[in-house]
Amino acid sequence: MKKFNDLMSVSNEIENISASEAKEKLNDPNVQFIDVRDKESYSKGTIGNAIHLDRGLLEFYLAEGRPLENDMFKNNPDKEYVVFCGVGGQGTLATKTMKDMGVKNVKNITGGIKEWEKIK
């Protein structure tokens, strides 16, 4: 069985940005923030205009031909996506999944919304 540190080692395979760097992108129309926390957490508050894509269903949103296929990714191949979760773990894995499934310009907020709250 994999250890937690092994699981999180994928952080070295993705692009991570700080909450401060993410804040600079908040009003950029070419950037879409994606909240991968559960629906309940999302409904309590999110970052700016972030859309909700539950981490547990992410592959179903990304895979072509799946019931939840999201045209946003297909129709906006040059858009930048900034992913976040609560503290960074789910965001890291979601960013890696998106990258592996062909999303080219995707970044993870290190420390998630918890770090974002510190700089608001």
List PLM regions with ranges.
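Conserved active-site aspartate in kinases
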Residues: D35
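Short, surface-exposed ligand- or partner-binding patches at beta-edge/loop junctions that are enriched
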Residues: F84
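Rhodanese-like catalytic fold shared by cysteine-dependent sulfurtransferases
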Residues: M1-V31, K39-E80, G89-K120
